[in-house]
């Protein structure tokens, strides 16, 4: 792909994207203790893409989204960085395709707001801290 900027000539920029039949790039998640410099791998299951990672309100916890290559199986995990433990909060599947958004908000009590098109329309859902649906 050529990149055009203010230079006289464009520059070529390449990026790796797996073609049909090729393996995906292997993506892993690691936690680093900045005091001890110890690095721990976080096991989020299958070799999925990790499109979104964000800190939750608790500074020891991360929210990690993974999605498979077909992009029809999305999982939301809670990762405790101190304990290096992972729990599944939410899983969505679709026969065709799941859109990845930035519509994830954690509230003060660790419940969270999530948007989904699971019924064909975009709706807002409220889940408790354990991933149980409270309200649409």
Predicted regions mapped to residue ranges:
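Internal hydrophobic scaffold segments of catalytic domains
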Residues: 1, 78-80
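Beta-propeller fold detector
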Residues: 40-43, 86-91, 134-136
């Amino acid at each position: 792909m050529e990149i055009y900027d203010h230079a006289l000539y464009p520059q070529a920029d390449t990026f790796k994207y797996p073609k049909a039949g090729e393996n995906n790039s292997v993506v892993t998640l690691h936690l680093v203790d900045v005091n001890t410099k110890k690095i721990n791998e976080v096991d989020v299951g299958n070799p999925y893409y990790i499109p979104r990672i964000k800190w939750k309100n608790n500074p020891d916890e991360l929210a990690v989204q993974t999605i498979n290559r077909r992009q029809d199986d999305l999982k939301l995990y809670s990762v405790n960085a101190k304990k290096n433990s992972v729990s599944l909060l939410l899983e969505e599947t679709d026969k065709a395709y799941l859109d990845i958004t930035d519509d994830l908000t954690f509230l003060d009590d660790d419940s969270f707001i999530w948007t989904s098109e699971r019924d064909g329309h975009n709706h807002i859902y409220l889940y408790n801290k354990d991933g149980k649906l409270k309200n649409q």
